[in-house]
Amino acid sequence: MSIDSLPPLREVIERHDLMPKKSLGQNFLFDLNLTSKIARQAGDLRDQPVIEVGPGPGGLTRALLAQGAYVTAIERDDRCLEALAEIAAHYPGRLRIIAGDALEQDFTALFPEGPKPRIVANLPYNVGTQLLLNWLLVEPWPPFYSSMTLMFQREVAERIVAKPDSDHYGRLGVLAGWRTQAKIAFDVPPQAFTPPPKVMSSVVHIVPRETPLPCRAEALGQITQAAFGQRRKMLRQSLKSIGGGALLEKTGIDGTRRAETLSVEEFVALANACLP
């Protein structure tokens, strides 16, 4: 079934009264060329499983299905479920709809066997960063997914790919750099969305590292949270609440440095120093 055989998205939204909700961080994409570009960025999707979070009325969903994917769409806005069901009827057996909150979803249970899914989503802005953190810190590793192609606000995208000694470098950049290889694929202007956000958006493509530096995710999460929670302070101060003095001494890292100057490898060393 061709994507062109489905009714236009604007018609679907009017028929189901699907005005985007600010409380859910919704910004809908209508441009079929753009949704197809996002789907292509995820690679060859023919007969491949894909997880989509926050599909809304299904603009990106249509593009993923048109590229041959088997899509599992997770949507917490009940208003959108009927519109998604109409798409599912056009693609029998290729669209599974889960009504619920992605933050509460056990993703590892969705695909107990077969190839690992790719995550492709225009993430709701109000939960996108937390979802990414959950996926970066998931255990066991390698993770349940094979890649992620995600839309974020440009500022968040820059934090994901940031390197030490840069303005955007922080906890997100350390965790992403530790376990994955991430790149900004392309930018999306505000006018591509309804309603248009006030900022530029970017699509980020993320591929897990098979063998990241050995480290406990929980410990690295704790270290980075403390270090960047007071990022303007010296490490001996920002890490004080978690025994930073001993950690710095054990690793030989200068306590007068600030968090944004440390490499991913140095953060891993601090996390490993937490071990008894």
Swiss-Prot record:
Record-level GO cellular component terms: cytosol
Amino acids binding S-adenosyl-L-methionine: N27, L29, G54, E75, D101, N122
Matches recorded under SMART domains: rADc (SM00650)
This enzyme's EC code(s): 2.1.1.182
Family annotation (Pfam families): RrnaAD
Uppermost EC category: transferase
Family matches, as HAMAP family: 16SrRNA_methyltr_A
Keywords assigned: Cytoplasm, Methyltransferase, RNA-binding, rRNA processing, S-adenosyl-L-methionine, Transferase
NCBIfam families found in the cross-reference section: ksgA
Subcellular location: Cytoplasm
Role: Specifically dimethylates two adjacent adenosines (A1518 and A1519) in the loop of a conserved hairpin near the 3'-end of 16S rRNA in the 30S particle. May play a critical role in biogenesis of 30S subunits.
GO molecular function: 16S rRNA (adenine(1518)-N(6)/adenine(1519)-N(6))-dimethyltransferase activity; RNA binding
InterPro entries in alphabetical order: KsgA/Erm, rRNA_Ade_diMease-like_C, rRNA_Ade_Mease_Trfase_CS, rRNA_Ade_methylase_Trfase_N, rRNA_adenine_dimethylase, SAM-dependent_MTases_sf
Primary location group: cytoplasm
UniProt record similarity statement: Belongs to the class I-like SAM-binding methyltransferase superfamily. rRNA adenine N(6)-methyltransferase family. RsmA subfamily.
Catalysed reactions, as listed in the record: adenosine(1518)/adenosine(1519) in 16S rRNA + 4 S-adenosyl-L-methionine = N(6)-dimethyladenosine(1518)/N(6)-dimethyladenosine(1519) in 16S rRNA + 4 S-adenosyl-L-homocysteine + 4 H(+)
Protein name (database record): Ribosomal RNA small subunit methyltransferase A
